[in-house]
Amino acid sequence: MIISSQLARMSLAGVCLGLSLAANARSQPEQASADIRRTSFGVPHIRAENERGLGFGIGYAYAQDNLCLLANEIATVNGQRSRFFGPDQFTVEERENRVSDLFFTWLNTPQAVDAFWQAQTPEVRQLMEGYVAGYNRFLGERRVQGLPQQCQGDWVRDITAMDLVKLTRRLLVEGGVGQFAEALAGATPPAAVAGSGGKQAAFRVADVRMQRFALDRGSNAVAVGSERSFNGRGMLLANPHFPWVGGMRFYQMHLTIPGKLDVMGAALPGLPMINIGFNQHLAWTHTVDSSKHFTLYRLQLDPKDPTRYLLDGKSLPMHKQTLTVDLKQPDGSVKSVSHVVYSSQFGPIVQWPGKLDWDNQYAYSLRDANLDNDRVLQQWYAMNRAGSLKEFQASVHEIQGIPWVNTLAADDQGQTLYMNLSVVPNVSREKLAQCSDPRIGLQMIVLDGSNSACAWDIDPQAAQKGIYAADKLPQLLRKDFVQHSNDSAWLANPAQPLTGFSPLISQDSQPLGLRARFALDRLGKLAKSGPIAAADLQHMVMDDQVYQAAQVMPDLLQFCAADLGADAQALAPLCASLKAWDGKANLDSGVGFVHFQNVMEPLEQLPDIWRVAFDPLDPQHTPRGLAIERAPVAQALRQAMLASAEQVKASGLRKDTRWGDVQVVSSGGEQTPIHGGPGTLGVYNAIQSVPRTDGKREVVSGTSYLQVVTFDEKGPQAKGLLALSLSSDPASKYARDQTLAFSQKQLSVLPFTEQQIKSDPDYQAQTIREQDTKLAVQ
């Protein structure tokens, strides 16, 4: 009995110890592990048993390829650039560090960041926590080896989940208040002295940046359904045009949790899920939409105090928020400075000299709908996991987390889907008419801030207060095709126009962009030649056709053939190069393409240059033709040609210069020629490049992640590439390899199945575990 009692006590103690250990284990984060298998071009295929493990693998792999990039962006979204790099240096977006820091200190307050974090699902939190652990794990390993040259400094540190929240919040406001950083940082009452944010040069750059937003973050998309595809199943062309550098640089990867998730595509920095991609049953992409995601409010100020405003006749004080930013001094010391941001109940006061002035009568407040969007990560993860197009569409309806893009998709059953279901302020056409000045136009929506009736309407069916519910937004489900190239929702498919929406959502009967006209023209021609194949979608991008050339080249050549008088000799080389040009933006296209760009850019700024004006009844073919018979048009054309001739000569370009000699990208320590050109000229393969001092042009954005996905009885069959390559580290072997493939127009199979992955000639596998000090490499 004594022995039995002792055994019983020992057993009970063992049970208690076991329960204690189990409880302690539950209170601790589960130790994560992941397999990282890399295939050609270093594309990581990350597999784990749960979200934390998957995030761990994503963060580790991303750090292997872009350690310094993410560290730099973390410093940015924490408002610490001035502290580490100095207040007068500039971000990659050409924004002064001091202004950037003030903006992100305002945007990412501890309260806002914590509220976003608390709103996340357990799965999303686990992904983010795993990502942090994976990134920090690789950072620790790399510190032992020595950090890359481009990120030597105390600004490189372990990250936290809150850092990823801040990155996400920056992404959310890219289509809204993020474009007003200078205006927010520079807003001061009329009696005060304007600070650094009021510099005119900074606002000129900001104005250009705002105008370029849709160009630098544009996109093309085509989804083909069973009625038009070669095999009766769905097909998708995804061609997002995004920056090649900085915090909006896509990263390619494949994510798997057996039995739960299997998705491949591309994601933006710091995001532990796919933004654009495909899974077993469907493929999807996004295009930047034309919807409005913020409104301005013109405040009527209290005559006694410009920091008070009148609402329904009552004087209300503006809220004052004091921000503190650390500035690195020339001697290396750090000085803290304070700045006050003013806000009304609608949002922060923004001051843009000559546009949005803060005087003694009026001030302007900005309300961004995406500041309250804490659903974006849940949204993309639900889309990643969708097992059907119906489930995919339902997730967007229910969550409403898409910030400022359209969504196009195709599935293995031959259905196609277009959704303009982003976060849009609920301002009806009627309210807009009552609450805005029609003379201002619709480029920026300015509502009456003195009348509470002009507040955004509330729909109980919407996911957040003040936005449109999903069933009030444009969407189209078809079996022939849907397409989009950053225009409104109107002609996603001309056979079924989408009309009658608030101007904040979509405007119809407006001129189409030239990329959309090209797409509809090409799809129309393909319809006459038979079913559409994957190669047809690839050629839409890789043909590098300059669609506008077909609209105006006969007129340009006719002008050249006329008597040019005293300018004949000066314009002879230009006219000869235009005549010899092939009408494309290929590497071997002649210098005529340079002249064409130089001539058309100033002409397009003028009114009434077209022989056939825009006709809303024929939007696919109008406007067209240069009205060279009109003296003002002929004079403007002559001046543009003379200017181009002089510019090309000064740049050192010769008659035998090719486009590939001009447009290049510097990566991996080398320069790579890049085909493609301005989307404003109708180049579907839209590439944005900026002039350099040596006469060349450096690529900054454009075709980034490119995928063409079809389906058969086995699942998705995909080809694609990441034009900017996987790694931003110039020392990496993955810094330039896909860029060369893009230059040569060589898309590769995207390995999705286990057989495809393991049979890849460059296959390598790595297993990582949180507790390991050594990694298993096979």
Residue map of PLM features:
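Hydrophobic alpha-helical segments
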Residues: 294, 402-526, 598-602
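Substrate-recognition/specificity elements adjacent to catalytic centers across diverse enzyme folds
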Residues: 28-247, 255-260, 264-273, 278, ...
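N-terminal signal peptide c-region/cleavage motif recognized by signal peptidases
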Residues: 20-23
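A terminal-accessory region detector
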Residues: 418, 427-433, 567-663, 669
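Bacterial N-terminal signal peptides that target proteins for export
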Residues: 1-11
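Second-shell loop/turn segments in exported
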Residues: 57-58, 102-103, 110-126, 365-367, ...
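Terminal end segments
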Residues: 493-567, 571, 661-778
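Glycine- and hydrophobic-rich flexible loops that cap the catalytic core of alpha/beta enzyme folds
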Residues: 257, 263-268, 277-280, 286-443
